[in-house]
Amino acid sequence: MARPAAARPVAVAITGGIGAGKSTALDAFRARGAATVSSDEIVHHLLAADEAVRDALVERLGPGILGEDGRPDRSRIASAVFGVPKQLAWLEALLHPLVSREYLTWREQLAELDDPPRVCVTEVPLLYEVGAEDRFDKVIVITAPRALREQRRRVARDDREARLLPDREKVRRADYHYVNTGTFEDMFEWVGGVMAELEAGAGARA
């Protein structure tokens, strides 16, 4: 039997630009006691374990995307779709519904635990771009100056972010906004305050 909504964890999404520090924020929430998962982790699982995904990738992109272990290799997939909008759109259309399914299953499993966490947090890079914000109770946007993000990622400027919603619009639509220009300790302290608010809200629902 499904638990009432009051017993379910507060569902939080973290989003932001490339190199802003989304994964670092997820680590901070994990350290503060939240249940966490990233879209990247879910994609890794799908590529490793879902035969239907493997077959679809080989049919579309060719057997060259397989690694030596016979599983889809993420770097080879990236090379096959980078700079080819049609292929990238196809890949996103294949994976995004599956990622959403896996995430919702994870969230349901958390709610069925004898002692479910009060807060569950997920890193979703394309949250607004794929229209997934309505699946979450709260949204956190992590931003940082462009030069700092490029330094963190060790990549040159390219057109990847041209496809993304501008930071100012993400911030306008979010519940929380953190400018990540400091240390992990700075973020950890900020996350502590957010967790206190989220847990208080979860308690009020119970």
PLM ranges: what are they?
Residues 1-11:
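Extreme N-terminal, non-catalytic leader segments
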Residues 14:
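Hydrophobic anchor at the beta1->P-loop junction of P-loop NTPases
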Residues 17, 29:
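P-loop (Walker A) phosphate-binding loop of NTP-binding proteins
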Residues 20:
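ATP-binding Walker
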Residues 23:
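Walker A/P-loop
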Residues 41-119:
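ATP-dependent small-molecule kinase phosphotransfer cores
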Residues 103, 134-135, 146, 154-206:
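Small-molecule kinase domains that catalyze NTP-dependent phosphoryl transfer to phosphate-bearing small molecules
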Residues 104-152:
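ATP-dependent NMP and nucleoside kinases share a basic, alpha-helical "lid"
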